[in-house]
Amino acid sequence: MHILKEPDLNDPKLRAKLAKGMGHNYYGEPAWPNDLLYIFPVVILGTIACVVALAVLDPAMLADKADPFATPLEILPEWYLYPVFQILRVVPNKLLGIALQTMIPLGLMLVPFIESFNKFQNPFRRPVAMAVFLFGTAFTIYLGIGAALPIDKSLTLGLF
């Protein structure tokens, strides 16, 4: 049993309407040639003009020249590795530091089992998951800021 009624293409009234162009929507604006020939080049050239203007008017200053004989005081990883670097730097036992980093994904995998919820429920009404997320985000930012500071100020962020 079909729910949708298929059109009868042998019907002369329907054939007459289709012959006049009815059945197709002609509202709106066609992509060809309006978008492809007029709007896209304007956007592309405008973007290139903005980039060139910024490069000419405000050139980015390069860092100091590389000196192979001058080692920096503290070598830092890329910014996205700061929290991991801080954990390894602060924990006295390196095996414990690796174990702590292994426990982070394991703890995140346990969150759905700790809190019973409906999968269609609003995620803002899941207090355990929200608390874990907010604490994890704040702690990651704390570790990232601490990694950029010297080791003696890294835990207190230089506030105490």
Swiss-Prot record:
Keywords associated with the record: Electron transport, Membrane, Photosynthesis, Thylakoid, Transmembrane, Transmembrane helix, Transport
GO terms, molecular function: electron transporter, transferring electrons within cytochrome b6/f complex of photosystem II activity; electron transporter, transferring electrons within the cyclic electron transport pathway of photosynthesis activity; ubiquinol-cytochrome-c reductase activity
Keyword Transmembrane in record: yes
Example GO biological process: photosynthetic electron transport chain
One GO cellular component, as annotated: plasma membrane-derived thylakoid membrane
Membrane-spanning ranges: 36-56, 95-115, 131-151
Localization per record: Cellular thylakoid membrane
Matching InterPro entries: Cyt_b/b6_C, Cyt_b/b6_C_sf, Cyt_b6/f_cplx_suIV, Cytochrome_b_C_euk/bac
Membrane-related topology note: Multi-pass membrane protein
Similarity field: Belongs to the cytochrome b family. PetD subfamily.
Assembly and binders: The 4 large subunits of the cytochrome b6-f complex are cytochrome b6, subunit IV (17 kDa polypeptide, PetD), cytochrome f and the Rieske protein, while the 4 small subunits are PetG, PetL, PetM and PetN. The complex functions as a dimer.
Biological function: Component of the cytochrome b6-f complex, which mediates electron transfer between photosystem II (PSII) and photosystem I (PSI), cyclic electron flow around PSI, and state transitions.
Descriptive protein name: Cytochrome b6-f complex subunit 4
Gene of this entry: petD
